[in-house]
């Protein structure tokens, strides 16, 4: 019993030779035998059918199965992570298909193998986009339904490729083409919008020139303006030549309408030019009366000032004459008696002062009389 057990475990290192005798390129002959990874519920794994001939023992039933599994495990552990990544699709089935592992092996070795296999499957093969779905059918559906090539032609189905499944997913290529089409549409819309803005800017400049030329003319009727605006506000499908023709046509229409409106206004002005004249003639007396009163008042003031000036001149003349006469009399008296000079001069000054006061009183009296006569003369108005 113990010898057989030791014989079993001693045979392990020698049986590692056949799996390592494969070519140096890293390809295993079992790789990609199952291209679609169906659920392995009732099937025996294809690895057991391909076991080496040295492990076949007819006298021990569970020995060949055990050593076949050990051979598979040793091959997986002996090779690098790149080999496990390349041979990942052969182990990526549902865990219910590996019932023979639970039946024939110890519980201590089974979780290690399953964790190692699941870890390699999650890290290497599936992308983060497909790691949410646990069902292998849902994961495989996009590759077989939407991919234009088969699974053998896809770059990540080969064992030696370093292309990730995310970079080759048809969803990504589809979104890329969708973004390209959106970019083309946006560039097309931007070009048409730019052409439309340029056309509108050109129309605005031409309209400003036309408006400067025809600013004194009357505006055309609303119907022609609406029709011309509809013809000019078409989308940018019109070429620049058509826009120029439309602008010239609109300018001609506006000139014709403005000429017609000018003729109508001239006729109206000629027809109604007589009425405002009569109205102005009827309104003239009021303005003339207002101006007449102002002129009358001004004339009265000027006449009053003229009368006062003339009266002052008369009073001055009289005053000078009196002064001259008194001066001659005093001079004659002083010549006769020089001692009377001081007394005569004092009397002369008093007389001259009295004559001046009389002249001022006479001027005031004249002004009051003149104002009273002017007030009496202006009452009838």
From Swiss-Prot:
Extent of Low complexity compositional bias: 157-168, 217-230
Annotated motif Nuclear localization signal, positions: 117-123
Keyword rRNA-binding assigned: no
Major subcellular location class: nucleus
Compositionally biased intervals (Basic residues): 175-187
The keyword Phosphoprotein appears for this protein: yes
Swiss-Prot/TrEMBL keywords: Acetylation, Chromosome, Cytoplasm, Isopeptide bond, Keratinization, Nucleus, Phosphoprotein, Repressor, Transcription, Transcription regulation, Ubl conjugation
Domain of life (superkingdom): Eukaryota
Residue numbers carrying Phosphoserine: 124, 128, 147, 154, 181, 211, 215, 219, 339
Residues with N6-acetyllysine modification: 249
Tissue and organ expression note: Ubiquitously expressed. Strong expression in the developing somites and limbs, the embryonic nervous system and the adult brain.
GO CC list: chromosome; cytoplasm; nucleoplasm
Positions of crosslink type Glycyl lysine isopeptide (Lys-Gly) (interchain with G-Cter in SUMO2): 123, 194, 213, 241, 249, 342
One of the protein's GO biological processes: negative regulation of DNA-templated transcription
Region spans: Disordered: 1-65, 79-260
Localization in the cell: Nucleus; Cytoplasm; Chromosome
Biased composition (Basic and acidic residues): 1-28, 39-65, 79-121, 130-156, 195-208, 231-260
Pfam families referenced in this protein's UniProt entry, alphabetically: Periphilin_C
Subunit structure: Homodimer. Component of the HUSH complex; at least composed of TASOR, PPHLN1 and MPHOSPH8. Interacts with SIN3A and HDAC1. May interact with PPL.
PANTHER family cross-referenced by the UniProt entry: PERIPHILIN 1 (PTHR15836), PERIPHILIN-1 (PTHR15836:SF4)
The protein's role, per its UniProt record: Component of the HUSH complex, a multiprotein complex that mediates epigenetic repression. The HUSH complex is recruited to genomic loci rich in H3K9me3 and is probably required to maintain transcriptional silencing by promoting recruitment of SETDB1, a histone methyltransferase that mediates further deposition of H3K9me3. In the HUSH complex, contributes to the maintenance of the complex at chromatin. Acts as a transcriptional corepressor and regulates the cell cycle, probably via the HUSH complex.
Protein name: Periphilin-1
